[in-house]
Amino acid sequence: MGQSTPLLVIGAGLAGSEAAWQIASAGIPVKLIEMRPCKRSPAHHSNDFAELVCSNSFGALSSDRASGLLQEELRILKSFVIKTADEHSVPAGGALAVDRNKFSSYITKKISSHPLITVQRDEIHSLPFENQISVLATGPLTSEHLAGDLKNFTGLEECHFFDAASPIIEGESIDFSLAFRASRYDKGDADYVNCPLNKDQYLKFRSELLSADQAEIKDFEKGVSNLFEGCLPIEELARRGEDTMRYGPLKPVGLWDNRWGDLHDKELRKTKRAYAVVQLRQEDKNGHLWNLVGFQTNLKWGEQKRIIRLIPGLQKAEFVRLGVMHRNTFIESPKLLNPTLQFRKRLNLLAAGQITGTEGYAAAVAGGWLAGTNAALIAMNRKPITLPETTMIGALLNFISEVSPKVKSNHKRDFQPMPPNFGLLPELNRRIRDKRCRYGAYRDRALEDIKKTQEFLEIGTPLGFKNQ
C-alpha cells in the first residue's frame, strides 16, 4: 500500500473501534489511542473498548424499522462491531441487545491482537499534525483539553446536552409473585420482565420522584441546561405531567399477566389491566442482570434505591449499577463536515460517532465504518466515498453534514443530535399509504443500493473486505 506511517484513530468507542478495524482490514497500519485508564470519563465503568455506557440495546432488529435497517446495511458492509453485537446478543424481543461486558471484552481482545493495530493508552490534548491522516472518534465524553483544541480548530463553540444512564439490578432480587415475563402484544418470546402498578402506586411513585434529591452537577458541566429528548431522565418525565411516564417508558398497553385471567374477557381487562408498567430488559446471556428500560436518572444514589424499591416486584432490588447523568459534546457538523466525514478545512482529518451529532449506537458504528473506510482510501490516494442518500446510513450522514432539502436554513442555527429515521430518506417514486408497507419499500430500495456500494468496494478488493 505504500503507507508506512500508521493512521491515527483517537477514541476506542463504537465508532473508533469500527474505524480502526476497517483501516486495518484494508491492510493499512493504524494506531488506536484511548485515554482510559489514564483518564476516566464520568460515565465509563471499565477500560474496555466499545463500552456501552447507557442502554445495552442497539434498537429494533426488524429492517422495516429505522434502526433495524441501519443495522442491516452495516451487516452488508461487513461491520466488525455489528457482527460482534449479533454474536453476543441476548433475548430482547424485537431488539438487538447485547451482553455488554462480553461484547466490549471481545472487541478489546480482537483489536488488541490485530497485527496492524497498535493500541496506545494515553490522553490526547490536541489534534494530530496536519500531515497525519486521522479519525476523531472521541465521542460525547471528549476530554476538556481536546475539546478546547477542537474549538480553536473549528472556530466554533462546541455544543452540549445532558445524557443519562439507567440502573441495572440482579435478576435474583426480582419478586416474580408480583412481576411477570412478557413482550408487548405477545410479539416473540417473553423477553421482558414487567412490574405492574395500579393508579395509587403510580401516583405515589411519581410523587417520590418529584421530591427526590438530585445529584450535584459537576463543575465542568455547569452552564449546560439542555437535555436530550431521546434520553430524558425519568424524573424529568415525571415533572412534565402526571401521565407523561405512562404514555412513555411506563406505558401499560399490550402487556398482560396470564395470572390475571383471560385476556379476551373485556370486563376483566377493564378491572385487571395495569395503570402503568415498569419494564426490565436482559443485560447478559444468563439473565442474571436486568436494566430498567427508560429509567435514565440523575437522582442521588440513595434516592434511586429507595424510589425504585417502591415498584412492585422490585421491593428487594439489589443494584449492580446505579444511574448517572453526564454532559455530552458534539460539533456543529453541518458547518464543518463533508458527507465523507472529512473536515472541510483539513481533508485528512475525519470525524465519526456521536461527536458528529448522530444519535444511537448503530449510527455511531456507521460513522466509524465510513470514516475508517475513507481514511484508508485517502491513504491509498483514492477518492473518498459517500453512501447513497436512499440508504439509512447515507441519509443520516448527509443530514449531519449539510443542509438537507427537507430541512431549511434553521438546521445550521439549531443543530441537534439526530437518530436514524425514515423521515431522512428521499421520497419513493410512488405513493404508498400504508406506513408499514411504505417503510418496507424504503427498506427494499436501501438494501438494494447498499449492496451495490459493497459490490463496488469489493471490485479488486481495494479495501480487503473479502478477507475479513
UniProtKB/Swiss-Prot annotation:
InterPro entries: FAD/NAD-bd_sf, MnmG-rel, MnmG_N, TrmFO
CC annotations in GO: cytosol
Keyword Methyltransferase annotated: yes
A Pfam entry, by short name: GIDA
Compartment(s) of residence: Cytoplasm
Residues that bind FAD: 11-16
GO molecular function list: flavin adenine dinucleotide binding; tRNA (uracil(54)-C5)-methyltransferase activity, 5,10-methylenetetrahydrofolate-dependent
Enzyme class: transferase
Names of required cofactors: FAD
Catalytic reaction annotation: uridine(54) in tRNA + (6R)-5,10-methylene-5,6,7,8-tetrahydrofolate + NADH + H(+) = 5-methyluridine(54) in tRNA + (6S)-5,6,7,8-tetrahydrofolate + NAD(+); uridine(54) in tRNA + (6R)-5,10-methylene-5,6,7,8-tetrahydrofolate + NADPH + H(+) = 5-methyluridine(54) in tRNA + (6S)-5,6,7,8-tetrahydrofolate + NADP(+)
Broad class of where this protein is predominantly found: cytoplasm
Gene Ontology biological process: tRNA methylation; tRNA wobble uridine modification
Enzyme Commission designation: 2.1.1.74
Purpose: Catalyzes the folate-dependent formation of 5-methyl-uridine at position 54 (M-5-U54) in all tRNAs.
Homology family: Belongs to the MnmG family. TrmFO subfamily.
Cited PANTHER family: GLUCOSE INHIBITED DIVISION PROTEIN A, METHYLENETETRAHYDROFOLATE--TRNA-(URACIL-5-)-METHYLTRANSFERASE TRMFO
Name this protein carries in UniProt: Methylenetetrahydrofolate--tRNA-(uracil-5-)-methyltransferase TrmFO
Species whose genome carries this gene: Prochlorococcus marinus (strain SARG / CCMP1375 / SS120)
Taxon lineage: Bacteria, Bacillati, Cyanobacteriota, Cyanophyceae, Synechococcales
